[in-house]
């Protein structure tokens, strides 16, 4: 169900001696013992709590939840991230030892969700703060989807070369705590201009002769009726 293939791992000799590389051995040990730091702020985290039970049993993947970022190599963000929480999230990520990975779980974490449409304090995606390895959409995602995201992360770890990952993270640092806003005009004023549908001519634009002629014709029509 969750087998990870190594292209250089299945080389055997006549004496059944396994030969591999140090990079593949390191990848195998890391993907088999992921220690996640659970960063849940909303209802998506309740779905992740279902994995702890006997039905899904995420211990079989080697997942051991940790409460300290210095002992974790995977941070799983679930829920809305506000501007006030952003420095704390970045600090937790910086305190994690290398190599470290991020799973963004839920629509609120990936794009800000429904809270980002008319809110000045919501981060429009956690990838603006820390680099994300696996995106898990859903509102909320099911436990089966979380297992699939963990499986995809394990496959990604099995194929990576550790020095290349370190260099890419140093060159492509995409997180920052400096958020600049520009105050705009509110659109919820209650005054809605529908002139683009129909705009009758103003009385100030009509010549006086035409206006009085039209008014007298209307008055005579009302008298006849």
Curated annotation (Swiss-Prot):
Subcellular location: Plastid, Chloroplast thylakoid membrane
Alphabetical UniProt keywords: 4Fe-4S, Chloroplast, Iron, Iron-sulfur, Membrane, Metal-binding, NAD, NADP, Plastid, Plastoquinone, Quinone, Thylakoid, Translocase, Transport
Database matches in InterPro entries: NADH_UbQ_OxRdtase-like_20kDa (IPR006137), NADH_UQ_OxRdtase_20Kd_su (IPR006138)
GO biological process, one term: photosynthesis, light reaction
GO molecular function, a single term: NADH dehydrogenase (ubiquinone) activity
PANTHER family given in the database record: NADH DEHYDROGENASE (PTHR11995), NADH DEHYDROGENASE [UBIQUINONE] IRON-SULFUR PROTEIN 7, MITOCHONDRIAL (PTHR11995:SF14)
Protein name: NAD(P)H-quinone oxidoreductase subunit K, chloroplastic
Reaction catalysis annotation: a plastoquinone + NADH + (n+1) H(+)(in) = a plastoquinol + NAD(+) + n H(+)(out); a plastoquinone + NADPH + (n+1) H(+)(in) = a plastoquinol + NADP(+) + n H(+)(out)
């Amino acid at each position: 169900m969750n087998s990870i293939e190594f292209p250089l791992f299945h080389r055997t000799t006549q004496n059944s001696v396994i030969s591999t590389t140090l990079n593949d051995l390191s990848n195998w040990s890391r993907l088999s013992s992921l220690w996640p730091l659970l960063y849940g702020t909303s209802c998506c985290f309740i779905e992740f709590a279902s994995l702890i039970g006997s039905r899904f049993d995420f211990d079989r993947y080697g997942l051991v939840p940790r409460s300290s970022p210095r002992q974790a190599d995977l941070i799983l963000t679930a829920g809305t991230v506000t501007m006030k929480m952003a420095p704390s999230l970045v600090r937790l990520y910086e305190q994690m030892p290398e190599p470290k990975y991020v799973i963004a779980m839920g629509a609120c974490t990936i794009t800000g969700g429904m809270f980002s449409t008319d809110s000045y304090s919501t981060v429009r995606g956690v990838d603006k703060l820390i680099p994300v390895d696996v995106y898990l959409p859903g509102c909320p995602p099911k436990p089966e989807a979380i297992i699939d995201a963990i499986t995809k992360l394990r496959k990604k770890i099995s194929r990576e070369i550790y020095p290349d990952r370190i260099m890419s993270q140093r060159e492509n640092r995409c997180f920052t705590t400096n958020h600049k806003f520009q105050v705009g005009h509110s659109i919820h004023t209650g005054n809605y201009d529908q002139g683009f549908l129909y705009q009758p001519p103003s009385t100030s634009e009509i010549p006086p002769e035409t206006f009085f002629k039209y008014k007298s014709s209307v008055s005579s029509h009302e008298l006849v009726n």
